[in-house]
From Swiss-Prot:
GO terms for molecular function: DNA binding; DNA-binding transcription factor activity; zinc ion binding. PROSITE patterns: ZF_DOF_1 (PS01361), ZF_DOF_2 (PS50884). A zinc finger (Dof-type) spans 45-99. PANTHER family: DOF ZINC FINGER PROTEIN 4, DOF ZINC FINGER PROTEIN DOF1.4-RELATED. It is found in: Nucleus. InterPro entries: Dof, Znf_Dof. Residues 102-117, 125-161 have a biased composition (Low complexity). This is Dof zinc finger protein 4. The gene is DOF4. Pfam families: Zn_ribbon_Dof (PF02701). Keywords: DNA-binding, Metal-binding, Nucleus, Transcription, Transcription regulation, Zinc, Zinc-finger.
Length: 282
């Protein structure tokens, strides 16, 4: 390990010696500002208006060190060294504006049609409630008199109220930029729907002929009837010609004659070609 060795002639001068004592003495003379870093505190600048020292430094005007700008917290004003003093306080919260009599009268009068209509409604309510109060007061004395004095006709508003309401309605109708009868919106896909309907629609019927074919149709019907008649007569003649040999044959071979059926079948004449009469033929 490294060992510290004392230097002859400097013992007690570096740490805790005469040098340390000199440093403490100098700091005590300069004050607490020197202990914090050696920067002296700025001198308090007096306000040129109120001579108050409650001021602070703001900045240098145009970065010029000869024109510092300060602010006075007492009179709330700025000033620049070498400049002109202006009597303009900072912030307008301290000043109070005075209201004129015309503005107060305008504020008290109804300025909008809605306020006029509200006043008219209040007047009508007051006029409607006055007969009720009178009838209620008389009801304390006699119930029958109260029932007899019940108002039968509603209170009618005054002419001034009607004029105010008409004026409000006219102003609202004239100043309304949006019409009340708005047409319904058109469908967005109207063209596409029409195109799809035209694609899937059935084909149109064929056009009607220019000339009429009523007489030609009748002629065709007559020709068809003639052809059918010829076809029906021709097969009948051929059939008769073909059946001529069969008609010329003797009909007795297909008939039993006068012999009863039982005697004919039991006589054995029809079984002469059978060699063994004991054989049963189905």
């Amino acid at each position: 390990m490294q060992e510290f060795q004392s230097i002859p002639g400097l013992a007690g001068r570096l740490f805790g010696g005469a040098a340390a004592a000199d440093i403490r003495r100098a700091q005590a003379q300069q004050g607490p500002a020197s202990r914090c870093g050696g920067i002296p505190s700025p001198e308090a600048v007096k306000c040129p208006r109120c001579e108050s020292t409650n001021t602070k430094f703001c900045y240098y005007n145009n970065y010029n060190l000869s024109q510092p700008r300060h602010f006075c917290k007492s009179c709330r004003r700025y000033w620049t060294k070498g400049g002109v003093l202006r009597n303009v306080p900072v912030g307008g919260g301290c000043r109070k504006t005075k209201r004129s009599g015309s503005s107060s009268a305008a504020s008290s009068a109804p300025s909008t049609p809605t306020a006029a209509t509200d006043n008219a409604k209040n007047q009508r309510r007051a006029s409607a409630s006055s007969p009720r109060s009178s009838s209620g007061g008389s009801g304390n004395t006699s119930p029958t008199a109260a029932a007899a004095t019940t108002p039968t006709t509603p209170a009618t508003p005054s002419s001034n109220t009607i004029a105010v309401i008409n004026h409000a309605t006219t102003t609202t109708t004239t100043t309304n930029p949006f019409p009340t009868d708005v047409p319904p919106p058109a469908p967005i896909f109207a063209d596409q729907a029409a195109a799809l309907a035209s694609l899937f629609a059935p084909p149109p019927p064929p056009p009607l002929p220019v000339f009429s074919f009523a007489a030609q149709a009748k002629t065709e019907d007559g020709i068809a009837s003639v052809l059918l008649a010829g076809q029906t007569t021709a097969p009948t003649a051929a059939t008769v010609a073909d059946m001529t040999p069969f008609t010329s044959l003797d009909a007795g071979i297909f008939e039993l004659g006068d012999v009863p059926p039982a005697a004919y079948w039991n006589a054995g004449s029809c079984w002469t070609d059978v060699p063994d009469p004991n054989v049963y033929l189905p």
